[in-house]
């Protein structure tokens, strides 16, 4: 996988202020504020910074937590995980493997088959609709 490196100025020119805050400074959007929280269309979710494919709509579920939730990533996603002890909590941060964008966090309270909940900021992803079948 090709790594993507840009300066802070380049990211600021490419992203809107909320996308930059969330993805480049490890911010968190307010619960229930993101455009994909209740989104149910068929397709894929990719990194808003570099278009790396991350999640399929078939793994999205309604968790009630206020952020888009997935029980698994695409087989090819290779999402990076690292410990996060900010804000007095112990969590696992999720990062795009191609550009190191902050995506959200992973928790062990999700549904089968994984038992995991990928809690993702809407500002860190964009949706690509599944093409209509002929």
Report the location of each language-model feature.
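A short Gly-Trp-Pro
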Residues: 2-134
């Amino acid at each position: 996988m090709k790594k993507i490196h840009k300066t802070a100025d380049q990211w600021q020119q490419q992203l809107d202020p909320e996308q930059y805050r969330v993805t480049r400074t490890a911010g968190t959007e307010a619960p229930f504020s993101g455009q994909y929280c209740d989104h149910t269309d068929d397709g894929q979710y990719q990194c808003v910074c570099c278009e790396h494919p991350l999640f399929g709509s078939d793994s999205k579920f309604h968790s009630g937590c206020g952020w888009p939730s997935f029980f698994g990533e695409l087989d090819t996603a290779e999402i990076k995980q690292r410990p996060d002890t900010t804000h007095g909590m112990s969590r696992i941060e999720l990062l795009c493997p191609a550009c190191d964008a902050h995506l959200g966090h992973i928790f062990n309270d999700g549904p089968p088959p994984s038992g995991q909940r990928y809690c993702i900021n809407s500002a860190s992803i964009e949706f690509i609709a599944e093409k209509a079948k002929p």
